[in-house]
Design a protein with these regions (language model features):
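Hydrophobic anchor at the beta1->P-loop junction of P-loop NTPases
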Residues: 10
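A glycine- and Lys/Arg-enriched "phosphate-lid" helix/loop adjacent to the NTP-binding pocket
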Residues: 104-169
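Hydrophobic positions on the alpha1 helix immediately C-terminal to the Walker A/P-loop
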Residues: 21
Length: 204
C-alpha cells in the first residue's frame, strides 16, 4: 500500500523569497529520494487565469467575488482528476504549494470580512488541511523594495508598503488563530536565502 503524501505550503508577502525557497526545498526533497510535485495558487486552470488578470489590476476588485473565485480555483486544484492535489497525495507524492487558503484570508481579508473568508474555506467539505504551513516573515518595506527592482508595474496588492503591512498583520492574525489546530511555523525571512533555507529544513 502506497503511503499517503504530504502537503507543505509556503506563505508570505510578495517579494518574501517563496519561489527561491520552494525551488531549494524541492531539490532537497528529491535528493532524499522523495517524489515531489511543485504547484501554486492561483493555478493555471481557467479560474486561476481569470484571477491572475484581476491581480494584474486589469479587472474589477470586488473582494467577495475574489474570495469565491479563489475558493473555486482551490477546489479544482484539489480535486482535478489528472492534476489535482488529491491524486498526487494518493501516489505518495509530497506536494509543495506556493500559497494556499492562508493567502485568501490575508489578502482578500483586507477589504472583506476575514472571518467569512476563513469560514467558506475551512468549512468546505473538499478542503485539505496542509501537513505543514511555513510563513516567511519579511519586513513589508523590504518586500516592496524587492518588487520595485524586478517589476515595472506592481500587481494589485503590491502598490504600497502600508497595504502590504495590513496583509502581513492579517497573516499573523489568522496564523495565530490556527496555530493550535494546524502545524504552522513562522520563519524570519529577513535573513539571507541560505539561512532561511536552513531554518526551513529544521521542520521538513
Amino acid at each position: 500500500m502506497v503511503k499517503q503524501g504530504k502537503i507543505i505550503v509556503l506563505e508570505g508577502l510578495d517579494g518574501c523569497g517563496k519561489s527561491t525557497q520552494l525551488t531549494r526545498l524541492c531539490e532537497n526533497l528529491k535528493a532524499r529520494g522523495q517524489k515531489v510535485h511543485l504547484t501554486a495558487e492561483p493555478t493555471d486552470y481557467e479560474t486561476g487565469r481569470y484571477l491572475r488578470r484581476i491581480l494584474s489590476d486589469s479587472l474589477h476588485k470586488n473582494m467577495y467575488l475574489q474570495s469565491a473565485l479563489f475558493l473555486a480555483d482551490r477546489l479544482e486544484h484539489i480535486t482535478h482528476p489528472e492534476f489535482g492535489i488529491r491524486r498526487f497525495l494518493s501516489e505518495g507524492t509530497t506536494v509543495l504549494c506556493d500559497r494556499y487558503y492562508y493567502s485568501s484570508f490575508a489578502y482578500q481579508g483586507t477589504a472583506s470580512d476575514i472571518d467569512w473568508v476563513m469560514d467558506i474555506n475551512l468549512k468546505c467539505r473538499e478542503m485539505l488541511t496542509p501537513d505543514l504551513c511555513i510563513f516567511l516573515d519579511v519586513n513589508p518595506d523590504t518586500c516592496k523594495n524587492r518588487i520595485d527592482q524586478v517589476r515595472e508595474r506592481p500587481e494589485l496588492y503590491e502598490k504600497d508598503a502600508a497595504l502590504m503591512q495590513r496583509i502581513r498583520n492579517n497573516f499573523l492574525q489568522v496564523l495565530d488563530k490556527l496555530k493550535d489546530r494546524q502545524n504552522i511555523v513562522i520563519i524570519d525571512a529577513n535573513l539571507g536565502p541560505d539561512e532561511v533555507e536552513k531554518e526551513i529544513l529544521k521542520y521538513v
